[in-house]
Amino acid sequence: MKFIGHDSDIINYLVNDLTLLNSTLKQFKKHEVDGEPAISLMFELAYTEADVMLVFRNVFKNGFDGNPAAEPYNVDSCKFYHIGSKIYLSLDPDESEDGHDGISEDDNDFVLASHVEGYIFEEGMGE
């Protein structure tokens, strides 16, 4: 496991170097970090032998119903933004013209948090 960034760094990393598009959400976990609500999402990336885990800390809103990773969940589209002092990820975003940029009330499967940390698990990396 290797730390690959936090907040804007991880967003830029997953836009430029790797992508969540066409990945599979393979783990979803609600928990606490330092006494604050957190959500961890593990993605199996499509174009590399790597998995990426995102840990959202100090979660304000959780727009996931149940455990989305209970069944295969393919990421066909997503929003991943730094909005003001918050981090926003939607795995089922509103793609209409009105909802394309920013948070939309029609976005689904989302998390809004103060911070996000990213970790990469590469095959043969030795943990």
Question: What are the residue ranges of the model-derived segments?
Answer:
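Surface-exposed, interaction-prone regions used to assemble/regulate multi-protein complexes
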Residues: 1-127
